[in-house]
Amino acid sequence: MRTIIEPFRIKMTEPLKITSREERVRALREAHHNVFLLDAEDCCIDLLTDSGTGAMSAQQWAALMLGDESYAGSRSWKRFEKKVRQITGIEHVLPTHQGRAAEAILAECVIRHGDVIPNNSHFDTTRANVEYRGGIALDLPCPEAFETDVPAPFKGNIDVAGLRRCIEEHGREKIPFCMMTVTNNTGGGQPVSMANLRAVRELVDHYEIPLIIDACRFAENAYFVHEREEGYGDRSLLDIAQEMFSLADGATMSCKKDGLANIGGFLVCRNHEWAECFRNLLILREGFPTYGGLAGRDLEAIAVGLQEALDYDYQVYRHATVEYMVQRLSDIGVPMVLPAGGHAVFLDARKMVPDIPPIQYPGIGVVNALYVAGGIRCVELGSVMFGKLDESGEERPSPLELVRLAFPRRVYTQSH
């Protein structure tokens, strides 16, 4: 694969600490073989997450100086609200300090004990917020999502037939909303097609069930739709994103991903009664509805970042970076989720170390080995993160044992 030129100049740098193998072995032992307990400075290449770890642009840094820190009705809030409404087309906009806060407010207002929340795949904080309220987080990925080496174009899709069976089994009264995660992080950063979203919209409309989008990587999903779905190749990413949100009744968002910021999120909805409940909880948990736990300068940076995330040249670079890594690893026979996801490389730990059974956590073994070998910090997305106990108390492994190497935005070059 050809070298990609990063579409930006670097204005500021941070030195990397190069450690020896012996130092890394000692650090990992002191961290009890839990990479989350490592000191960040001991991680030469930190691919633990793409959330809040990116580099802001010069325009975002400049926007910080415009921050209006008024408690209520600040100029920064107005700019933030205007940008979110432009992209989503949704009336009620509530800022939060990050995405999980938006999920928690949604869950507390809407979910009751025993409710079922179907999703293409919940990520960990979404699942935790559903289950904390006594709900059942039900993953319904499309069948091809489980075939990691099959390069289907939209492996993030939901199983629409499975969703229909779920609704018929549990009943509309037990499903306060259906959720779609774009892109599907748990399933390998894979995209959701517009056709799949429309099919879900048609189905939930029939049963009068609201549709909520987990929009953390909405711009990356829009790029995939532009590149892979017929009829969208001549549309702007903003136009595609607007169509995507037009199919939803609301959305949660971590602006630490496709807001290109280090903190922040939002919750949007069309339902006036929901919005009133959301605002009341926002005041209690986060802050006044025009700042939501964020400084005015953060609202400014997010407003700029949301626009920059929809820049086509940026997305070309972003996806080419991931594709380059996938191609290089594939060339030497490393099993992984194909095709390349939008924000990360997902290694198939079950195939990499087939002698380690799932209940002995092959993903953790691969994560620790990568750190010892090269100072690379990444994360397991398998039975440690998503495993469950069955009714007898026995451990039930996750369907997939993945290791995610998530790429912080605009931080590392191809040389890294």
Where would I find each of the regions flagged by the language model?
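Beta-rich nucleic-acid/ligand-interaction surfaces
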Residues: 102-105, 344-349, 387-389
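Conserved glycine-rich beta-strand-loop-beta hairpin in the small C-terminal domain of fold type I
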Residues: 322-323, 337-349
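Short, conserved charged micro-motifs
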Residues: 276, 354-362, 410-416
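PLP-dependent enzyme catalytic core of the Aspartate aminotransferase-like
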Residues: 385-416
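Active-site loop ensemble at the mouth of alpha/beta enzyme cores that anchors a bound cofactor
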Residues: 322, 350-378, 392-398
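Conserved PLP-enzyme active-site core in the AAT-like
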Residues: 2-33, 37, 43-54, 60, ...
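Conserved alpha/beta core surface patches that mediate binding of polyanionic ligands
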Residues: 161, 283-287, 378-391
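Short acidic (Asp/Glu) and glycine-rich catalytic loops that position anionic groups and cofactors
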Residues: 279-282, 300-308, 343-352, 398-405
